[in-house]
């Protein structure tokens, strides 16, 4: 016989009613409801992070040091090697061109770093350059202009 969804049944003993505790004193789990007598564990609940009195983990760990500079400027970075790969024919390279090629996100500041080699002359116009990037662009016959 093939198994069908409407023939499926839970295994015997798999389903049992939940035990309702603290309902009258005559039954097995009345009065103290299986919690024993008195003490913290008998009263309401114990915090999930409570470790029995030892120094809790969140107090054993060190506090974070330092601060976050609210005036920090973050740049999208592009290497000279990436420019050489994306623009093999050279020419003008602006932030919009880099966004169009998928090298950086739009509406973000762009910085060119000096990793990689450049063989064609490119006129790069972005927000910032490193010293090595300027040198490599100039050595290839191009210009590096900051916005």
Curated annotation (Swiss-Prot):
Residues 1-45 are annotated as: Disordered. The keyword Zinc does not apply. Residues 15-28 have a biased composition (Basic and acidic residues). The keyword Zinc does not apply. GO terms for molecular function: rRNA binding; structural constituent of ribosome. InterPro entries: Ribosomal_uL15, Ribosomal_uL15/eL18, Ribosomal_uL15/eL18_sf, Ribosomal_uL15_bac-type, Ribosomal_uL15_CS. SUPFAM superfamilies: Ribosomal proteins L15p and L18e (SSF52080). One of its GO terms (biological process) is translation. Keywords: Ribonucleoprotein, Ribosomal protein, RNA-binding, rRNA-binding. Pfam families: Ribosomal_L27A. PROSITE patterns: RIBOSOMAL_L15. GO terms for cellular component: cytosolic large ribosomal subunit. Part of the 50S ribosomal subunit. Belongs to the universal ribosomal protein uL15 family. HAMAP family: Ribosomal_uL15. Binds to the 23S rRNA. This is Large ribosomal subunit protein uL15.
């Amino acid at each position: 016989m093939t198994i069908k969804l409407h023939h499926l049944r839970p295994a015997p003993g798999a389903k049992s009613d939940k035990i309702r505790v603290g309902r009258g004193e005559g039954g097995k789990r009345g009065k103290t409801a299986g919690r024993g007598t008195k003490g913290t564990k008998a009263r309401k609940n114990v915090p999930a992070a409570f470790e029995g009195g030892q120094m809790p983990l969140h107090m054993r760990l060190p506090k974070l040091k330092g601060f976050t500079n609210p005036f920090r400027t973050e740049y999208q970075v592009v290497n000279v090697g990436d420019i050489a790969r994306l623009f093999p024919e050279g020419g003008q390279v602006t932030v919009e061109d880099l966004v169009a090629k998928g090298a950086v996100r739009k509406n973000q500041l762009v910085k060119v770093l000096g990793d990689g080699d450049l063989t064609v002359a490119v006129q790069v116009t972005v927000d910032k350059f490193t010293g090595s990037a300027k040198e490599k662009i100039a050595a290839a016959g191009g210009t590096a202009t900051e916005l």
